[in-house]
């Protein structure tokens, strides 16, 4: 019997519309999407999704929430249910138990374990994930953590993550070098780019500290920050105190992929001292290597796209001298090596961090009953 999928998720983030559309085109799948979560996030227009059926109202109780109208979906003629894999969603616990009784398949699309869970959270997660038939986990790292906790590896699949793969590939084919940085900075120094919200937890001052150290070593760089300051971090003030304000460009937020492509392609390296998330996919899609910290328990799954010496580097978390050394290693590459790095970046995206890869994983999950 051909699988009939029911996809229940807490919200429809803007970046997931392309993968949801592809799922809708490839499988018989209906989508039930939550109306809001407690953190501000940009959503897509649900009516644009071919398989969209209904918006579910999320009722929050502190960190926990209940999706009104989700339980009745178990009584419909779906064969498989794809859930977020969030233990905080109380209604999903009931759906899992009910589906178990009705002999229906359940699939988690989840971060799984980070490896730094408290004793209580560890127990709750173990019980919760054991209720699923299959687990689609964002990273191999999380799968390895779950294996160590007794989860059956045959029931786990690495789903990775993606952006609008076809769109980004089309932009990539038109990429070329430009002089936007030399025009802005009035020099030809290597450029470090950070792209994302400017928050205190991102520890962006470490980039300024590294730039100052490199300046003192007679290896000056420019730094561009692409994103909105949502935490009053005030990087310009910090850069001025370090005496390198003329080498810092506060670009502001940018959501246009073709503009981001030019910024990434012409930069030397993307640095994220905090965790690295979807920015990694954006950077590598446009040929820019990445540097981030090496504490994987505090990382987002996209850190796995970094292959040391090929698509970027990891530095010792909190060690600014090591971050500086890693930046220096990348910016010291000659043009031939820089071009090889671009090709490695493209190769990594084409291999795993794209929609086609995710669709193939979902096919395997549905085939291996």
Q: What positions do the PLM features span?
A:
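Acidic donor-binding loop of glycosyltransferase active sites
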Residues: 262-275, 288-289
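Donor nucleotide-sugar binding/catalytic pocket of nucleotide-sugar-dependent glycosyltransferases
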Residues: 132-179, 187, 194
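Short hydrophobic beta-strand element within catalytic cores of glycosyltransferases
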Residues: 289-298
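Nucleotide-activated donor-binding/catalytic signature segment of Leloir-type glycosyltransferases, i.e.
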Residues: 2, 226, 233-254
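Conserved donor-binding/catalytic core segment of Leloir-type glycosyltransferases
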Residues: 6, 181-202, 208-211
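A charged, aromatic-enriched C-terminal amphipathic alpha-helix characteristic of glycosyltransferases
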Residues: 332-366
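A short, histidine- and acid-enriched strand-loop-helix "catalytic/donor-clamping" loop
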Residues: 104-123, 131-134
């Amino acid at each position: 019997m051909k699988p009939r999928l029911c996809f229940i998720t807490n919200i429809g983030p803007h970046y997931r519309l392309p993968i949801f559309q592809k799922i809708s085109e490839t499988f018989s799948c209906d989508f039930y999407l939550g109306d809001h979560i407690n953190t501000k996030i940009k959503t897509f227009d649900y009516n644009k999704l071919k398989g969209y059926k209904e918006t579910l109202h999320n009722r929050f109780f502190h960190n926990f929430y209940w999706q009104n109208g989700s339980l009745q979906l178990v009584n419909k003629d779906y064969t498989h249910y794809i859930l977020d894999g969030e233990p905080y969603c109380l209604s999903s616990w009931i759906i899992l138990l009910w589906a178990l009784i009705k002999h229906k398949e359940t699939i988690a699309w989840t971060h799984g374990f980070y490896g730094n869970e408290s004793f209580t959270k560890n127990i709750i997660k173990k019980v919760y994930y054991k209720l699923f038939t299959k687990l689609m986990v964002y990273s191999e790292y999380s799968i390895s953590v779950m294996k160590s906790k007794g989860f059956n590896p045959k029931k786990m699949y690495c789903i990775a993550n993606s952006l609008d793969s076809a769109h980004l590939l089309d932009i990539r084919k038109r990429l070329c070098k430009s002089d936007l940085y030399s025009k802005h900075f009035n020099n030809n120094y290597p450029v470090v780019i950070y792209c994302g919200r400017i928050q205190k937890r991102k520890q962006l001052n470490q980039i300024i500290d590294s730039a100052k150290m490199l300046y003192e070593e007679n290896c000056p760089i420019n730094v561009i920050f692409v994103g909105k300051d949502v935490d009053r971090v005030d990087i310009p003030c910090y850069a001025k105190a370090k005496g390198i304000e003329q080498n810092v460009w506060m670009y502001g937020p940018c959501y246009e992929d073709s503009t981001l492509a030019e910024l990434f392609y012409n930069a030397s390296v993307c640095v994220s001292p905090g965790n690295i998330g979807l920015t990694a996919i954006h950077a590598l899609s446009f040929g820019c290597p990445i540097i981030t910290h090496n504490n994987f328990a505090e990382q987002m799954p996209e850190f796995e796209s970094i292959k040391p010496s090929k698509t970027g580097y990891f530095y010792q978390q909190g060690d600014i001298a090591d971050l500086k050394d890693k930046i220096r290693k990348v910016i010291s590459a000659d043009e031939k090596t820089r071009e090889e790095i671009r090709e490695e970046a493209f190769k990594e995206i084409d291999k795993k961090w794209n929609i086609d890869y995710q669709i193939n994983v979902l096919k395997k999950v549905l085939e291996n009953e």
